[in-house]
Amino acid sequence: MKKINRKHKDSVFVDLFANDIYAKENFISLYNALHKTNLDPKTTEVKPVMLENVLYMSYYNDISMLVDGKIIVLIEHQSTVNQNMPFRFLEYISRIYEKITTEEDRFGKKLVKLPIPEFYVFYNGVENYPSESELKLSDAFLIPEEKHNLKNNDFKLEITAKIININVEKDNPILHQCEPLKQYSDFIKEVRDCMKENIENPFTTAINRSIKNGVLSEYLKRKSTEVHNMLFGEYDYETDIRVQRREAFEDGVEEG
C-alpha cells in the first residue's frame, strides 16, 4: 500500500493503519473486524483516498481507503466527540467523490457508479462515552414543529457515523477481533498512565514499557523516534483544544 504524503503530521493511529510498512495488514484486520469478513491482505487491493487540508491544526487523524467496493472513512478522537461529525463526513465524502471521478464523469449523461461510503469514529478519550453509539446528520436538521414526528427514514439525505469506544476499559468486542487495534489501545493507555505519573519523559517511558510488555513492540522498536514525535504533536494539539474550550467558556461567562 502506497504511503500517503501530506503536509502536516499524521497521528500514531494514521501511521499504524495507513502509512507503516504493515499498514495494509493492520487496516485489513480492522476492516475484517468491522465487517465480519476474512479478506486476505495479500490478495485484497486497498487504495488510499485521503485528503489534504481536512483539519485546521497541525496533524491528521483521518484515514480513508477504497476497498471491497467501499470507501471506509475512519476518524480517531482523543477529546470530546464532535456532534457535527456527520456534517464533516458529508463534506469529506463529497470531496473524495470529486477526487476519484473526472469532470466528464460528473457532467456526462451516463450513470457514474460510486463506492459505498462508511463512516467510523474511534473514540479513546477520557470521558465516559458509550461502548458504541451513532450520530446522524438528520439530528442537525431544522424541523418545523408540526413535523416533529418524522422518522429517520423520512429524510432524503442522511449520514450515519458509528462511534466506537476503543478504550481498553470499555472492552468493545472489536478489540478482541483486531489485534493491531487492541495493542494500539493498550499503548495509548500506557501513554496516559505515564503522563498521570508526572514522569519527566512520559512518551519515552511509555514506548519502553510497551516494548517490554509486547505491546506494538516490533512497530515501536522500529519507529520509536517517529512515534515519540507524533505523540508530542498529538498531545500538544489536545492541550491547545482544551485551552481554546476553556477560554471560550470563560468568555461566555464574562459576557453573561
Language-model segments: what does each one mean?
Residues M1-E255:
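Elongated, amphipathic alpha-helical interaction scaffolds
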